[in-house]
Amino acid sequence: MALTLVGIRNDVAASLGEDPADIPLDENLIDYGLDSVRIMALLGGWRREHDVRADFADLAEQPSIEAWAPLLGVS
């Protein structure tokens, strides 16, 4: 199954222990407590479950769901 914007938001929220509705699409996720270890864990899961080919550096450079969507293959 393809990764979706909702799926990314849900996964990020779960990683942070937050409600998905509290995670904006366009905000810097570092400001919400996302760190490099969590980014790596999220990316690992997406690679296994959705065959994502994004690089950690690309996600770390642009830490927002909106910026990640095209990198993760969400159209």
Model-derived regions, located:
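Short, solvent-exposed loop/helix junctions and linker helices
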Residues: M1-A2, V6, G33-S36, Q62
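Thiotemplate assembly-line natural product biosynthesis machinery
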Residues: M1-A21, A41-G45, E49, P70-S75
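Phosphopantetheine carrier-protein modules
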Residues: A13-Y32, E49-A57
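Short, structural beta-strand-to-alpha-helix junction motif
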Residues: N28, P63-E66
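Phosphopantetheinylated carrier protein domains
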Residues: V37-P63
